[in-house]
Structures are given as C-alpha cells and as structure tokens.
Amino acid sequence: LNDVPHGDIRMEQYRSPVTGRIKACWVYTPPGYDHAHTESYPVLYLQHGVGENETGWIWQGKANLILDNLIAENKCRPILLVMNAGYAFLPDEDPTFFPGDYETELIHGCIPFIEQKYRVAAGRKNRAIAGLSLGSVQSFAIGMGHRDLFSRIGVFSGGFPISRPEYDYTALLQN
C-alpha cells in the first residue's frame, strides 16, 4: 500500500429494471471527490469474469489501489469506477452460464442511477466499458451495440461474443 491519497469505495443499491429486485454495485470515487463539488468525472464501467461478482475488481484486482497510484503519479486523470454484478436473471431463468439480460440492466438501470447520483461528465466521450473474461465479452457486445453511449471498450482475456445478427463485426471494427 503506497503512501498516496486514496479514493473511496461505496456500495450503492438501485432497483433493477430487468428483475425488479434491489441490485448492488460498487463505486470508486477518486481522492478529493467529496471536496471538489463542481468537478464532474468520466466513468469506467468495469465488468467481472464468470463466477465472480461486483466485488472481484476490488478484492482480487485491487482496482481502487491501482487507480489511486496512477492518479497520484499523474498517469491517469481522476475517474469514477463502477463495478456491477454482471448478471440479471429473472426468478424462473436458469443461471447456468449466460448472464441474463445484463445489457438492459446496465443501460437502463445502473448507468442512469450512477448519472443521477454522482457528478458524471456528460456524453459518450466520458464513458467507457471494460471487462475480464465473461465481462470482456459483455463489454464488447454492449460497447459495440451502444457506440452512442461508450467511446472506449476494454477487452481483457476474452473473445467475441456469440454471433449476433445485428453485428457485422468486420464493419464495426473498421469504424
């Protein structure tokens, strides 16, 4: 643990538009967030891998400590980091592997909640999505399907999602 200013980790709860249940997400706010009352911040929505949950990037990945150090060394500007459980199953759905309708969960649940509660810089240029393993597949599919919402996509140890007829991957990657 380096002697640098540290941000905060906050657990938030909102009602899922997919399941109707209360859902938790974790939000990293950079050092000084609570004192910089007029500053707005870009957001990275960071997705976990299969078998993990919204706490994986904090407890295993130490994403908050990595950001603290990058910000202190001026290698990264202060951002908000949102880590959400990448699943959205209805009570009668089989949660064996696929994450349910997580796309709707993120786009119509988590993002509006975060943008209402936190000082988020407006527009797609200030919103990114990234993930590991299953989270990378989700990030790629959601990011490519909503290029009006996300300016950057990070894919870590993942692949292309299952074929979706609305995506012509070759054309999308060329754009």
Question: Where in this protein do the model-derived segments appear?
Answer:
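Non-catalytic cap/lid and distal C-terminal segments of serine-dependent acyl enzymes
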Residues: L1-N175
